[in-house]
Amino acid sequence: MASSSAPRFRVYSKYLFLTYPECTLEPQYALDSLRTLLNKYEPLYIAAVRELHEDGSPHLHVLVQNKLRASITNPNALNLRMDTSPFSIFHPNIQAAKDCNQVRDYITKEVDSDVNTAEWGTFVAVSTPGRKDRDADMKQIIESSSSREEFLSMVCNRFPFEWSIRLKDFEYTARHLFPDPVATYTPEFPTESLICHETIESWKNEHLYSVSLESYILCTSTPADQAQSDLEWMDDYSRSHRGGISPSTSAGQPEQERLPGQGL
């Protein structure tokens, strides 16, 4: 019994590259058989080429181009049998042909006669876009888009498969390219509401900018009479300075020191 953790076989592509090792089938017979097996995918072109190893044993290469994308989940789906010997089964290695041009050049590189080659249909010269082409397309999208919506729309049109499986990544990129505008801060309380009103102004002058006799005695441990005198002096002093008394600019000249022995 196969392990449940074994990877599931699947080939999903319009273009298939098949290799039948040690295959003695005629290329034309293999081609006709594959046309029947792949009929539902509407084949456009099939090339079957027989190649001989150095020891003389043959193997068969086949390139198939379909109109519809083939979904092959059974590795034995394209097995071929001989009419004369139904027990002779030829099992292929099945791959997606990423570049049909290169595959066709590879399988026909050393064909020595038409007997070893069979072709049907019209070859479609297609190839998968390279990484450089995809990078250039993405760069053009980034530079030309002007909003998140336009960026995501262009990515969806150019890279539909990537867009369907990596939408969150593209949305993150869109937010990075076109961030939300910074909101202007509006204070909850306007500056005008912070101005002291008359009631608060009176309380402020009475409690914050004045010293009661009891507080002064408590802080300085001064007798009541002395504390009262100190507070009256501080009040008078503060009032005189608030009244704008100009500071004195006169200064007494120091007397010259009298040296010993000098008379009057």
UniProtKB/Swiss-Prot annotation:
Location within or outside the cell: Host nucleus; Host cytoplasm
Residue positions of motif LXCXE motif, interaction with host RBR1: 194-198
GO MF term set: DNA binding; endodeoxyribonuclease activity, producing 5'-phosphomonoesters; metal ion binding; nucleotide binding; nucleotidyltransferase activity; structural molecule activity
Designated name of the protein: Replication-associated protein A
Domain CRESS-DNA virus Rep endonuclease: from-to ranges: 10-123
Main location: host cell
Motif (RCR-1): 17-20
Purpose of the protein: Implicated in enhancement of V-sense gene expression. Acts a an inhibitor of C-sense gene transcription.
Single biological process term from Gene Ontology: DNA replication
